[in-house]
Amino acid sequence: MMLVGVVGKTNVGKSTFFSAATMLNVPIGNYPFTTINPNVGLAYFKTKCVCKELGVQDHPTNSVCINGIRLIPVKLMDVAGLVPGASSGRGLGNKFLDDLRQADALIHVVDASGSTDIEGRPITPGSHDPLEDIRFVENELDLWLLNILKNDWSKISKSSESNFDSGVIQIHQKLSGLSILKADILTAIEATGLMNKKLSTWTEQNLLELVKHIRRIAKPTTIAANKIDLSPAPLNFEKIKSTGRSCVPCSAEAELVLRRAADKKLIEYLPGDGYFKIVSQLGDPQKKALELIKEKVIDKWGSTGVQETINFTFKELLGLITVYPVEDERTLSDKKGNVLPEAHLIKKGSTAKDLAYKIHTDLGEGFLYAIDARKGLRVGADHELLDCDVIKIVSAKARG
């Protein structure tokens, strides 16, 4: 399961975002829907289920389906708070960077209203530019990667003087513990014009440009423009968007209020919906709070933006699609009769054999062929899967 880190400075709503995103209580298989550890929790990728399209009543086992909407568990990490100088170990810098080693992508929660300074101290709304926060996080990550590469750089460059590929391998070895792939490094080298140039000729500026590209590829980031209901957040949101960064407007506080109300059975609300329904007797303060959320957030922005941020990160940044493996292509069920039991998130471009390995190593090792259940067609190992495919894996080895 891929892991997305939620980052941000103090007082921007980072922990509120994390709490709201991970508090939905739904019974799914054997997943522990408490916090995995003090700073890792389960959120959900929300997608339209194929059950209604295929005219079946599903019985999910690794996810949940609510009125034709499939919620698939994903992992979020509440990364230690960040202050300038983290790359040098200031504050919780070392903890922050250690957390980030594991992350496949980031959600950077920023105070779009500009009501906190660079250190997270409360100030007059509009007196701080949230783009400064975005740049400082990017800068700290770049310096962190740069420092890792610079350590032993002389040795790396000398030992690969006559063998460029050896240099690439050594760079990958230095960064492999950070969930950075060799392919990411090669893409970054190509983008910076350093391909096949002797490493001994690379300047520190070359290295800095290289790590910037690596960071964009290996730690792609969605900006969650939080406190969107406060002025001048909408203007700052547009300003951030104009830089070409991936940005979603949100109100983490509004989402947390709605999820808590739904948890107490006061309202009916599914994360990401543009509406909620009051189903219990409410006091005047509760009614007023919900009316404000509807007026200031949902009616204006379509939703609170928290679920949209999660979905955008996993679907657009990480390039994941949803596939439904089954054991019987006619009944669309597993051996216990559960219809559309599992929904898996896999990388766009993945093959039938990739899916087999994701389900279980034994299935992958014994892979013979797969069946596209929609079309009733037999497909081979290299068949590229599409979003919402329903697939049966036929293997010489049983699933363990």
Locations of regions flagged by a protein language model:
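Conserved G1/Walker A P-loop phosphate-binding module
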Residues: 1-162, 175, 216, 220
